[in-house]
Amino acid sequence: MKWWLILPLLAAPAIAHADPCEGRLPDRAGQVFSGQTRYVGDGDGLCVGDSTNPSTWIEVRLADFNAPELNASGGRAARDQLRRLVMGRRLECVATRGRSGRVIVYDRVIATCRLDGRRVGDLLRAAGVREGGN
C-alpha cells in the first residue's frame, strides 16, 4: 500500500480545524491588549485583532473559564455560546500566568478578557455554560 498517498487525507481534518490566528502574542503578565473578536475556536479560546488580516490576530486562552473540550459533552454548546457573546465585539484583555506559570501555552496567550467591563468567564457562567475542561 502506498502510505504517502493516504497521509494527506489523514492530515486534512487537522488542517481544516486549525485556527487562523497568527499574530504576535503578548509575552509578559500584565500586558494589556484589545481587539475585535475575529474567531472563536472553542468554549475558552478565541482570537482578537483590529484588522481583518489573520496575521495580526492574537490567539487567547481565557484564564478565568475552563470549557469542556469540543468533542466532550457540552463542548460545542460552550463554543456556540462564546460566539454569541463576543463574536465581532471588542474585548479588552490582560495577559496573565496560567497554571504552568507561563503566559504563553500551546501558542496561545493566557488572558482575562472583558466585554463592556465584564469578564468573559463570568458572562459564560451567567449564560449557564458549564465548566469542565483542562
Language-model features, listed with the residues they occupy:
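Small beta-barrel nucleic-acid-binding modules, primarily SNase/OB-fold domains
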Residues: 2-3, 14-134
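Sec-dependent signal peptide hydrophobic core
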Residues: 4-8
